[in-house]
């Protein structure tokens, strides 16, 4: 972060907003006509009026081609120029604008001729005029568009290129549709149609290529770079990619009637903060990680906003989001808490109303909090209020206000698509998700910034299929993904993300609502890309509809381009049986390892039930087999909770008309079985009512885990675990089984149901770790559940479709260290418990973890239950394991006592007293790092299997690590020089001449003064009459001297000199001479005073003593977790040989001194400058 001391007042967040946009009386008054406004209007037009004819032609004139002059055309490249900091040369600019003006004039003539011809289509003169106007228009466009692709200016001219390309495609479609009536021969029409299909691909690939080039160009490490990056991404999505996504609809032979598309991509407004665009160094990647990863579309239902307070300032500290699948077709699901649930004020609930949230008016808050005198300043970057406005086509809906309405208006950057109506009706985007950018830098600053995601309004809440149009539905609007199907980032021209499979199986299920009569027949088409030949299968409500063979479209390893995708269809028409149905798409007959991508499906208008007696008999048998006896006293051990749910589904599907009494009786028995299952389950909250709800009980997990309601696989809640990009930050879920629930010398079993998984690691930990990595294929391959079944009359999953019979032999049990094939969705893992001790409370840790990028899992119906008492060999084995564990535990305690004592001595020696509120006068940064490393030599602070779980030594580790943090804070506070280590570049320093801050191989930032005329200085406030120590660590290259001078306005000057000398040089008040640097380096690199130890000093215990849990005969063993030792540790690299540390004492007579750095010749390299107040 940039610690600029001159930042002492709030800078309005919207100072960079469009000055022509005002907020007046709650309405947005638009006084300008920007490229974004034009593009949004055009996108709306293309989405709603994509029908050939005079209406379309005149619509393009009204939106852009009939109203633009040179200044309006110039606004398009200017917009991008400002984003990429590149100015187009005057000649290229003038040429482009001249071409666009010529096209505009010509198209207005074309449009007027088209209008006249459509009014009198048989008039020979008008037909001849249309042939002339088309040829002129096509020739002009063919010539002009390549001139808009000027070398080196492709990016700034991209938005006008796309406008011209869109115009060209529309004209080519006109001739493809109307050419025969204009009098063109069939050969000409076919030739122009071939031009159309070819140019759709060419223009698309060009636009995406240069969009990506520009996006890469604006990326940088700091927050101001990310702001520009996000603005480029957002604005060019609106002005380029959204328009390009509709290019394929110009294919008049594929889309001869009205075609309705949807844009499911999301764009993002900046985290709402004051000073955000330039205050945070190195945070771009952190901010970008806050953006939601590719996902199925969901519908934002509610936001619960929590409030925290910091020194009297209330702010948005965290929030909880609930959402529903598309069409509200499944149970509502909740995302993990973003930020933290502050309790400074009651939570504020923002619930979905009308057509969703179309506008936010936010109030960012920035405060610099002065904590007494000196450098102890805190900065607060938060949001203290937001008004949420709801969209409606008919009436004003009351807004929801969190604390207060602000002035940062989302409509300033994402304006409406129609300015002729109120924004509530003319809005272009609705709020789809909110994440939280959180950062707390100790006592330096606190940052809590909600980040709003916005989705185009064309992405409807439901999948509606009418009768009179071609309906395109992106498959990211699916309700469920088949096992092995993933959502991946779209290639840029699909209007959103796409689905991907690498093995045969179900792709997804899509819930659709039919508004046409059920007699209406359709043909289905699929837009896909594939590296292999394959078969597509479709079904509706579990009923097979189509099956066909299709060819590969791309080579393995090639990038996705427009030509990689193909739209294919089936010849056999079909009709829906229900107004609300489930459409299922699957891919089969290809080898795993190939890639299949699905963009969307299109519905084009064209022109099983067991007998009731058998159902009852089967249900009765299934219920009776749950119990150990006919009196239903106990459950069979091998009856899982998941199986009870499936039997319950079987009973619920019995016919009320035929066997209502028997159905009710069986239902009571199944409920009794479910209660027995709950009673024997030792897990807390097995139904996943929440994660991280309570600190000391229930489930704990990472924030990217989602809880979802029951679907057609799970009757109850289940959890979804996603992959991770960093092994040290895995996706995890864990719970501890308390010692009080366990019986001595007993075997326990963890089991559950996995819908699908890859790289899912399961652990049971007591004396040692039982560990399995589970890869389970999804329901589309082995387990044909009701994923293809229709929904019920109220939108619930129809669980009455046929299932595979439950077979205990398919259970995947991993017992006594045996390896498991994991061909089944059922899993189980055993662990043996020896002697129990309530005081020790060892318990059993249950852990689920994914640490790979491609990993994923969906699981539920988890159970941890008593299996059987231990006897014979099993009893002897657990006693042996317990004894070994206790022996190693005792050894660990002995070794820890020694290491802790040494670490505590190192930490204590940093401070003056046991209150740890004041450092020793000679404590330096290297001593603190050395003590920190000593603290990190304490083993078993956290479990090696999951480093968020405290180990046996967590308390003493965190105690000492807290004091290390205090030492760093105190050390930073007593150095009155700002940015004395140059980690923030030249911030706070005044510079004359040329100097650099470089990062050397040892990852330290150093000041490099390469020229004798250069000077670096800083004015520092001090206390007159007090003593200070000026300490400088530096290195001199070549001849001459490097000097660090301290002085006041008049006299009282002293300096430290550095030279690359051989003979000894002595300076007054200096504690080190030129020939002393070797000794000095020894102090930095490995040895310190008697009150502290350095890095290289040998510890008093062996460095490789084994983990106390390791037991190779009982498990696969446990190894150290390298991520554990990264917790809180500041990697410190000693200085290279050659650097010298010198210091002098200084007694200022006024309240200001100047520190000046310079040299006489050669190069002067400064590592750090410190001015430390002497202790009184």
Curated annotation (Swiss-Prot):
InterPro entries: Cry1Ac-like_dom-VII, Cry_V, Galactose-bd-like_sf, Pest_crys, Pest_crys_Cry1Aa_dom-IV, Pest_crys_dom-III, Pest_crys_dom_I, Pest_crys_N_sf. The keyword Ligase does not apply. It comes from the Bacteria. GO terms for biological process: sporulation resulting in formation of a cellular spore; symbiont-mediated killing of host cell. Keywords: Sporulation, Toxin, Virulence. GO terms for molecular function: signaling receptor binding; toxin activity. Pfam families: Cry1Ac_D5 (PF17997), Cry1Ac_dom-VII (PF21463), Endotoxin_C (PF03944), Endotoxin_C2 (PF18449), Endotoxin_M (PF00555), Endotoxin_N (PF03945). Disulfide bonds: none annotated. The keyword DNA-binding does not apply. Belongs to the delta endotoxin family. Promotes colloidosmotic lysis by binding to the midgut epithelial cells of many lepidopteran larvae. Toxic segment of the protein is located in the N-terminus. This is Pesticidal crystal protein Cry1Aa.
């Amino acid at each position: 972060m940039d610690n600029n001391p001159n930042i002492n007042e709030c800078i309005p967040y919207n100072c960079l907003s469009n000055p022509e946009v005002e907020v007046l009386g709650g309405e947005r008054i638009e006084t300008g006509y920007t490229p974004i406004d034009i593009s949004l209007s055009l996108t709306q037009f293309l989405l709603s009026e994509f029908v050939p004819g005079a209406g379309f032609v005149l619509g393009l004139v009204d939106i852009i081609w009939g109203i633009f002059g040179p200044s309006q055309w110039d606004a398009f490249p200017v917009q991008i120029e400002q984003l990429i900091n590149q100015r187009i040369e005057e000649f290229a600019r003038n040429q482009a604008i001249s071409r666009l003006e010529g096209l505009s004039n010509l198209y207005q003539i074309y449009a007027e001729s088209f209008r006249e011809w459509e009014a009198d289509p048989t008039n020979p003169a008008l037909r001849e005029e249309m042939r002339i106007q088309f040829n002129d228009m096509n020739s002009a466009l063919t010539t002009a568009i390549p001139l808009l692709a000027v070398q080196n200016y492709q990016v700034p001219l991209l938005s006008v290129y796309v406008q011209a390309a869109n115009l060209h495609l529309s004209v080519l479609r006109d001739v493809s549709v109307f050419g025969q009536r204009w009098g063109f021969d069939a050969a000409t029409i076919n030739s122009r149609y071939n031009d159309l299909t070819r140019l759709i691909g060419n223009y698309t690939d060009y636009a995406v290529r240069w969009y990506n080039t520009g996006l890469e160009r604006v990326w940088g490490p700091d927050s101001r770079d990310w702001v520009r990056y996000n603005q480029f991404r957002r604005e060019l999505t609106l002005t380029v990619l959204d328009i390009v996504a509709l290019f394929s609809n110009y294919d008049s032979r594929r889309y001869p009637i009205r075609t309705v598309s949807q844009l499911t991509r999301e764009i993002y407004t900046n985290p709402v903060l004051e000073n955000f665009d330039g205050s945070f160094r190195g945070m771009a990647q952190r901010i970008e990680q806050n953006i939601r990863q590719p996902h199925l579309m969901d519908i934002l239902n509610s936001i619960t906003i929590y409030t925290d307070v910091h020194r009297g300032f209330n702010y948005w500290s965290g929030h909880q989001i609930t959402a529903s699948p598309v069409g509200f077709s499944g149970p509502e699901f909740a995302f993990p808490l973003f930020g933290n649930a502050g309790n400074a004020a009651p939570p504020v609930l923002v619930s979905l109303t009308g057509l969703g949230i179309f506008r936010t008016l936010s109030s960012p808050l920035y405060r610099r909090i002065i904590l007494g005198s000196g450098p102890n300043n805190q900065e607060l970057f938060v949001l203290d209020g937001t008004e949420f406005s709801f969209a409606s086509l008919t009436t004003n809906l009351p807004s929801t206000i969190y604390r207060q309405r602000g002035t940062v208006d989302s409509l300033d950057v994402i304006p409406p698509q129609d300015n002729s109506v109120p924004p509530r009706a003319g809005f272009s985007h609705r709020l789809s998700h909110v994440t939280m950018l959180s950062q707390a830098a100790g006592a330096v600053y606190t940052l809590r910034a909600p980040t709003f995601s916005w989705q185009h309004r064309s992405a409807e809440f439901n999948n509606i299929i009418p009768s009179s149009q071609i309906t395109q539905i992106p498959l990211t609007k699916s309700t469920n993904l088949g096992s092995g199907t993933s959502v991946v980032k779209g290639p840029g021209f699909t209007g959103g993300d796409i689905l991907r499979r690498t093995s045969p199986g179900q792709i997804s299920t899509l819930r659709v609502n039919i508004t046409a009569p059920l007699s209406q027949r359709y043909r289905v088409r699929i837009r896909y890309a594939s590296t292999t030949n394959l078969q597509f299968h479709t079904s509706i409500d579990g009923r097979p509809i189509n099956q066909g063979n299709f060819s590969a479209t791309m080579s393995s390893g090639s990038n996705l381009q427009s030509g990689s995708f193909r739209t294919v269809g089936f010849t056999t028409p079909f009709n829906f049986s229900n107004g609300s149905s489930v459409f299922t798409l699957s891919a089969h007959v290809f080898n795993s390892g190939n890639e299949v991508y699905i963009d969307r499906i299109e519905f084009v208008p064209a022109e099983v039930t067991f007998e009731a007696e058998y159902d009852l008999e089967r249900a009765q048998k299934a219920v009776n087999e749950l119990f150990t006896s006919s009196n239903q006293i106990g459950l069979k051990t091998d009856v899982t909770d998941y199986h009870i749910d499936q039997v319950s589904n079987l009973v619920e599907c019995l016919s009320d008309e035929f066997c209502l009494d028997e159905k009710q009786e069986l239902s009571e028995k199944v409920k009794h079985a479910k209660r027995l299952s709950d009673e024997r389950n030792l897990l807390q909250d097995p139904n996943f009512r929440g994660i991280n709800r309570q600190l000391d009980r229930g489930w704990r997990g990472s924030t990217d885990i989602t809880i979802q309601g029951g679907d057609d696989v799970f009757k109850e809640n289940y959890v979804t675990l996603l992959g991770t990009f960093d092994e040290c930050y895995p996706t995890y879920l864990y719970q501890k089984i308390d010692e009080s629930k366990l019986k001595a010398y007993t075997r326990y079993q963890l089991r559950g149901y996995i819908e699908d998984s890859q790289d899912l690691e399961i652990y049971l930990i007591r004396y040692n770790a039982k560990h399995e990595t589970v890869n389970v294929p999804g329901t589309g391959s082995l387990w044909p559940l009701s994923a293809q079944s229709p929904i019920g009359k109220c939108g619930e999953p129809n669980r009455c479709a046929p299932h595979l019979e439950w077979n205990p032999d398919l259970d995947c049990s991993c017992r006594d260290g045996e390896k498991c094939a994991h061909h089944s969705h059922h899993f189980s893992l055993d662990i043996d418990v020896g002697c129990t001790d309530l005081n020790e409370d060892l318990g059993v840790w249950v852990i689920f973890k994914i640490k790979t990028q491609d990993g994923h899992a969906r699981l539920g119906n988890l159970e941890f239950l008593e299996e059987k008492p231990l006897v014979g060999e099993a009893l002897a084995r657990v006693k042996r394991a317990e004894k070994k564990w206790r022996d190693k535990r005792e050894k660990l305690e002995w070794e820890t006592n020694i290491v802790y004592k040494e670490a505590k001595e190192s930490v204590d020696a940093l401070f003056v007293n046991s209150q740890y509120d004041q450092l020793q006068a000679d404590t330096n940064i290297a001593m603190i790092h050395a003590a920190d490393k000593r603290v990190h030599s304490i083993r078993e602070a956290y479990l090696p299997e999951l480093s968020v779980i405290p180990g046996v030594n967590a308390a003493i580790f965190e105690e000492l690590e807290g004091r290390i943090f205090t030492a760093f804070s105190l050390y930073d506070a007593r150095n009155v020089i700002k940015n004395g280590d140059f980690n923030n570049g030249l911030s706070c320093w005044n510079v004359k001449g040329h100097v650099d801050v470089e990062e050397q191989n040892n990852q330290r930032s150093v000041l490099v003064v390469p020229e004798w005329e250069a000077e670096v200085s800083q004015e520092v406030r001090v206390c007159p009459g007090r003593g200070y120590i000026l300490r400088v660590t530096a290195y001199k290259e070549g001849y001459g001297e490097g000097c660090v001078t301290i002085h006041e306005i008049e006299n009282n000057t002293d300096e430290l000199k550095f030279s690359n000398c051989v003979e000894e040089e002595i300076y007054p008040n200096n504690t080190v001479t030129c020939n002393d640097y070797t000794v000095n380096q020894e102090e930095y690199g490995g040895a310190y005073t008697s009150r502290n130890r350095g890095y290289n000093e040998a510890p008093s215990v062996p460095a490789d003593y084994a983990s106390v849990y390791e037991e190779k005969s009982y498990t696969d063993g446990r190894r150290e977790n390298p991520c554990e030792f990264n917790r809180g540790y500041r990697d410190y690299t000693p200085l290279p040989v050659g650097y010298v540390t010198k210091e002098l004492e200084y007694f200022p007579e006024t309240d200001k001194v100047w520190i000046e750095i310079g040299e006489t010749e050669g190069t002067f390299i400064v590592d750090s400058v410190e001015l430390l107040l002497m202790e009184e």
